[in-house]
Amino acid sequence: MTPQAILADLVAIGVLPGAPNARMAGYVQAYLARYGVDCAVLTGPEGDRVNLFATIGPRDVPGYILSGHMDVVPVAGQVWTSDPFRLRVEDGRLYGRGTSDMKGYLACMLAMVPAFQAMALRRPIHLAFSYDEEIGCRGVGHMIARLPGLCAPPLGCIVGEPSDLQPVLSHKGKQAMELRIKGRAAHSSQPDLGVNAIYPAAEILLFIRDLAAKLEAAGPFDPRFQPPHSTVVAGVVQGGAAVNIIPDQCVIQMEVRSVPGQSPQAITAQVLARLAALPQVQVSSCELSSYPALPPPEDRVLADLLERLTGKLALQSVSYGTEAGLFHAAGVPSIICGPGSITRAHRPDEYITVAELEGCCAMLRRLGHHAAS
């Protein structure tokens, strides 16, 4: 099948994060089975979502992982020109939810299976399909934990997030948290009988603001990123039910993005310490999502290979995060390189071009020849 035909099938299977993905996983399994490729089904702790891992070539020698996620962001509230879950072809563009992020890469991975099989690979090419990436890379960690039983230590992992097929070397880490402050409700005419949860929440918001300013002023700094320092923001604040009720609860959702070398958890810990010190209220917190930074590589082996395969110089860093940080944390050299543009991701009328799919397949074909040499 052509990558365009496969992409049409994948777009029609609109798996949202946090939802069962049996239909998508079944499609990938059936496709691989047609070419005699076995696929390990790795059920996550949720029970209704799976990662998939398949190998082409010898299993007992180090090879390369091609990794991508199967879920896509929702289309609710967006105005599309056409059905987002039906591929529309127009002037060399292929429109549909997930075309750039990142079903285009998955389609190219699958389309190249027969070519890989014909190459008599001396080093294997592994195909990794993860779930729930769009809500904090929740699924891939369960697959990474099982890699030792699935393959020899890999030489590298190519995470195919949309990068205009330009290799990307690093990204920041992230942790998103929800903070809950519980006071005591009362009638607004007798505020002394209640404990207003919004006021201590305001103290936390000011602490987050001041912490952000401290990071901006004092670093640590990494000029490869923009901005060149870690950041912390409060993105959601919810509290109160009515103006005549002393609010008994306030919720803050905050996010940290940290430069390599500074963990997001270390920054969050400062906020949690301030939260715990609040008087007269009960407090709690929970992690919404997190992933580690992808630091610049210690050597250029994988970067040099991808520059040769793509014909493009590597980009030092990007502002978004990926599953590559998790692969790296597990000891797998990792790089980001995929077709499509991040500027089109998550937007109405998301698209990828036919030329971008062709370019990705050409890059993967060159990888196959490298693995066969």
Language-model features: where?
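Metal-dependent amide/peptide-bond hydrolase catalytic core
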Residues: 45, 169, 176-373
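Acidic-glycine-rich active-site phosphate/pyrophosphate-binding loop
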Residues: 75-89, 154, 169-180
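Phosphate-handling active-site elements
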Residues: 90-92, 112-127, 150-153, 208-218, ...
